[in-house]
Amino acid sequence: MMYDDTIAAIATPPGEGGIGIVRISGKDALSILERIFVPVRPGRWKPYRMRYGHVVDGAGVRVDEALAVFMRGPRSFTAEDTVEISVHGGPLVVERVLQQALAAGARAANPGEFTMRAFLNGRIDLTQAEATLDIITARTTTALALAEAQLGGWLSHELRRIRALLIDPLAYCTALVDFPEDEVEPQDVETPLTAAVQALDTLVATAEQGIIYRQGARATLVGRPNAGKSSLLNALLRIDRAIVTPIPGTTRDTLEETANLGGVPVVLTDTAGIVESVDPVERLGVERSRQAVAQADLLLLVVEGVSQPVDDDREIVALTRDKRTVLIVNKIDLIDGADAVQECMKFLKCAYENLRGVPFDATIAVSALTGQGLDMLGATVARLLLGDSSPADGRLVTNVRHRDALARAATHARDALDSFRRGVSPDLLAVDLTAAINAIGEVTGEAVGDDLLHAIFSRFCIGK
């Protein structure tokens, strides 16, 4: 699909930088470039060759010195003729260059329109288009590696393979409807269907872990006032994000920041100490703390290594009873000797588990002040959120939309297999097989409507 118009946008982030790039794509990209860019050395444009010159306005006045490159379609990201102009990275300069492109006949691009053209022109499928956005928004190296693997096409290839496994049984079913006197060997239907079901189930099983790597999880720090929750937040973030003082009750509201814990982007929520109070501001902070506990995927119960449980701890510990919880024994820098730390951990674990009524999922000793134990804490949080397995060659389904569509495909394929084994008529088998193939098409983009495409690409930035 080739578009009649040509689009342009700034492809670099807003603000000052070393360079700014204006991207132009469409059938008139080269003619627009020739109108607004004057190379130092005249001559015909050769694709994929960078040229030095100046961007000029309609009167021939120089706007900025620049480097420009022309990429002829379909050997470009959008599969259309594409131009990129690199200029100095000041916001005003880049905006002026864009305005020259628009004045020369380009249209301002919509969010994600370059990537959408790449998809609609067959350059990439929808899984790869979504992976492009995931690369931009990745918050950990693991999430980035998963997105790059998906952009590389592993999921596209696997779904084409599964689709082919479903096409042959569908062809047999269609033939039997038209020519019922023909015979089909059972293995010609059962073998590929069984393989398709197994492959779809395998993909869906990876999604729980993959989605956490991509979207992250929520962990809430809870504990009595002055247990060191804010200090621990700062230590995990490696910045002084929360105000820390020796005065109990310094934190009056919830505070959220994202940390990379064991390769997982975890939204950490620091909370006000949960205590009874007549202060209306403090009571509001406590209520928000309770809400943060309810929304958390994991709780981090912070206690002081140099103190013992008190009555106020009962209510706090009760909030953790139905949630996965790590008991964090903080301030171990105040305890002399490794043996004493172990004895302290053993005592506090027993005491707080007696209050809780059920064991904690893990107990970790840390010092927010010195950093001792923080790496182990990060690894423990990641293990509890993900399980013990690690990504296999980056092959995890990371998108909720993909998971849901593939789960439906697996259900339809399984129903078709069960129906075949029970001798159900071919026309009914074909219904489930077609539904499974269409569900796979929702993932790759072969069976999606304009509304879904708009929803996906509108999340991209302008210029991508």
UniProtKB/Swiss-Prot annotation:
Q: Which residues bind GTP?
A: 226-231, 245-251, 270-273
Q: What is this protein called?
A: tRNA modification GTPase MnmE
Listed binding positions for Mg(2+) are S230, T251
Q: Which residues bind (6S)-5-formyl-5,6,7,8-tetrahydrofolate?
A: R23, E84, R123, K464
Question: Which EC class heads this enzyme's classification?
Answer: hydrolase
According to its UniProt entry, this protein's organism is: Roseiflexus castenholzii (strain DSM 13941 / HLO8)
Question: Binding positions for K(+)?
Answer: N226, T245, I247, T250
Q: Which Pfam families match?
A: MMR_HSR1, MnmE_helical, TrmE_N
The yes or no answer to whether the keyword rRNA processing is present is no
Q: Which UniProt keywords apply?
A: Cytoplasm, GTP-binding, Hydrolase, Magnesium, Metal-binding, Nucleotide-binding, Potassium, tRNA processing
User: Subunit arrangement?
Assistant: Homodimer. Heterotetramer of two MnmE and two MnmG subunits.
Q: Which gene encodes it?
A: mnmE
Q: What the protein does?
A: Exhibits a very high intrinsic GTPase hydrolysis rate. Involved in the addition of a carboxymethylaminomethyl (cmnm) group at the wobble position (U34) of certain tRNAs, forming tRNA-cmnm(5)s(2)U34.
